[in-house]
């Protein structure tokens, strides 16, 4: 029988711990998000982790429970729109703990509201001098994209919108430059020939609606 044995001392905490929320997204409209967790240690056998912060049921580190280390984890953010911070601590098999890694994301569950002023005229033709209708619109929050088009009903969603083109001279019927301020007053001009194309070529009265998409990816109703 052997009269000796090997005993390993390991006091090194897990290295290179990092976390991303929804692949590094800045905004989310959904409280349920996906975490991507990483650790640079070559072998993570026996590792565990704690997740806390703006997390339902785990506001503080002591509220969180140790669970088996995983590179992916779905969590639910706490109620209330605003900046959310999630922390992750990784512990090795002999309970050396890493420093907390963190990531942030802004929760925005609100639906943008669009306000239209105008139009200056409610009937147009294709004849110069009578072929243009102008209006202005604003949104109640910062938005990244907008579109103006014909919809079948007043309560139609953006997926039903036939965007009015700009071939005939219409302007500001769509945009995707991003970060449009909520205070920005956008003037849109609809030209008769473009309106006719969007309408399928037939005369008649049509519903024109403006949609904006906020930075969380939610379109106005």
Where are these regions (language model features)?
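Low-complexity, disordered linker/stalk regions enriched in Pro/Thr/Ser/Gly
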Residues: 1-221
């Amino acid at each position: 029988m052997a009269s000796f044995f090997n005993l390993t001392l390991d006091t090194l905490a897990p290295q290179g711990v990092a976390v991303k929320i929804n692949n590094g997204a800045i905004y989310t409209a959904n409280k349920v998000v996906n975490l991507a967790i990483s650790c640079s240690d070559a072998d993570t056998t026996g590792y565990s982790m704690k997740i806390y912060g703006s997390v339902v049921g785990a506001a503080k580190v002591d509220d969180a429970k140790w669970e088996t280390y995983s590179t992916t984890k779905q969590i639910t953010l706490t109620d209330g729109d605003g900046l959310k911070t999630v922390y992750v601590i990784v512990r090795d098999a002999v309970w050396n703990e890493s420093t907390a890694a963190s990531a942030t994301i802004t929760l925005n569950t609100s639906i943008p509201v669009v306000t239209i002023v105008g139009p200056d005229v409610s009937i147009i033709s294709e004849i110069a001098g009578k072929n243009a209708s102008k209006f202005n619109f604003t949104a109640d929050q910062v938005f990244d994209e907008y579109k103006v088009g014909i919809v079948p009903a007043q309560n139609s969603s953006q997926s039903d919108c036939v965007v009015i083109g700009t071939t005939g001279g219409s302007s500001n019927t769509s945009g995707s430059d991003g970060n449009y301020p909520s205070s920005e007053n956008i003037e849109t001009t609809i030209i008769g020939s473009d309106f006719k194309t969007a309408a399928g070529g037939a005369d008649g009265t049509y519903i024109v609606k403006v949609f904006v998409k906020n930075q969380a990816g939610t379109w106005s109703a």
